[in-house]
Amino acid sequence: MKQKLNTVMLQEIEAVHSLLLELEEQHRCIIVNDIFALEACVGKIKDANKNIAYIEVERRKLTENRAMTEIVEELRDEKLESNYHKIKQLLQEVILQKDTNELLIKQGLSFTNRILNVLNPVRETKTYNAYGKVKK
């Protein structure tokens, strides 16, 4: 079981690393405003996520839905522990990159909306409601 689990974890490291590379490519596309390449990144990211999910199912079959920390402590294998920490570190990097990309996209959308409001302002008269807030 130890060898099989180690093999599956190595596959998982490779899959998560490929997802990280795709997210970095998405980041590059966001920075240079390459919309068509950004659209192509979406499909690649989905494929990488499917691959990770498949490998995760394989790992859960091997571990019988037990927690990985419990298994790593029980088996006390250096390679297994090293791979476990590599996966955790890669996952943190993926989360950071994903959050950065989402923030940049939201920032770009906010900027675009402000520019549109400057170019085409709302022509309605502003009225106040009972709470003193401006209705939109």
Locate predicted features.
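Extended, charge-rich alpha-helical scaffolding segments
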Residues: K2-L75
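Short terminal interaction segments
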Residues: E73, D77-K136
